[in-house]
Amino acid sequence: MFIISQYREHRSLSILTQTCTIFRSMQVSSKHENLSVSFHLTPLQVLIITGTSSGIGLAAATMALEEGAKVLGVDISKPPDSLARHANYQFFQADLSHPEAPARVVEACSRTYGDRIDGLLNIAGVMDLNQSADSLSDNVWERCISINLTAPVKLMREVIPIMKLRGKGSIVNVASKAALSGAVSGVAYTASEHPWP
């Protein structure tokens, strides 16, 4: 597994696109049960990408489609028409804070593309309104943790058995550099965005 950190804060699509091109040439090895990991996109690879309606998720989906991949895009908001109309893009609307959403995402991918998942890009994320610990509501805490941390873990749990059957697959978990520095505000976001080992 490889973790991309530091990039969620960028808002420029050109910077995001440049960042996402890193995926094209990256080779990473995995220590988990001979599961090979490669970020070399080839035509017809099937990818699940969360957060495809804006930001890094949109840039990653656009790049993957340009490379010939088939993408199941997941977001709570509908994607831009330019993405939605692409022949190799299928949108699945889901609120990743709901406990059953990750399983439904993988079921939708299987219905659309069969029992093949070559990659999972966990990019969707939410902020916590920069609330400090003494003003943080339970709802904001739970939403940040469920979308930024729990949903990616559940999605990995769903796709790894499929990847093991094929003997290969790639997982990218996008984290934030905010998790590596302390601050008075942003407690839930910081806790939920720590890069995983």
UniProtKB/Swiss-Prot annotation:
The protein's annotated pathway: Secondary metabolite biosynthesis; terpenoid biosynthesis
Cross-referenced Pfam families: adh_short
Keywords assigned: NADP, Oxidoreductase
Biological processes per GO annotation: terpenoid biosynthetic process
One function term, GO molecular function aspect: oxidoreductase activity
Catalytic residues identified in the record: 189 (proton acceptor), 189 (proton donor)
Coiled-coil residues: none
Ligand binding (NADP(+)): 49, 95, 157, 189
Cross-referenced SUPFAM superfamilies: NAD(P)-binding Rossmann-fold domains
Top EC class, one word: oxidoreductase
EC number: 1.1.1.-
Family per similarity comment: Belongs to the short-chain dehydrogenases/reductases (SDR) family.
Other noteworthy facts: In A.calidoustus, the austinoid gene cluster lies on a contiguous DNA region, while clusters from E.nidulans and P.brasilianum are split in their respective genomes. Genetic rearrangements provoked variability among the clusters and E.nidulans produces the least number of austionoid derivatives with the end products austinol and dehydroaustinol, while P.brasilianum can produce until acetoxydehydroaustin, and A.calidoustus produces the highest number of identified derivatives.
The protein's role, per its UniProt record: Short chain dehydrogenase; part of the gene cluster A that mediates the biosynthesis of austinol and dehydroaustinol, two fungal meroterpenoids. The first step of the pathway is the synthesis of 3,5-dimethylorsellinic acid by the polyketide synthase ausA. 3,5-dimethylorsellinic acid is then prenylated by the polyprenyl transferase ausN. Further epoxidation by the FAD-dependent monooxygenase ausM and cyclization by the probable terpene cyclase ausL lead to the formation of protoaustinoid A.
Protein name per UniProt: Short chain dehydrogenase ausX
Annotated gene: ausX
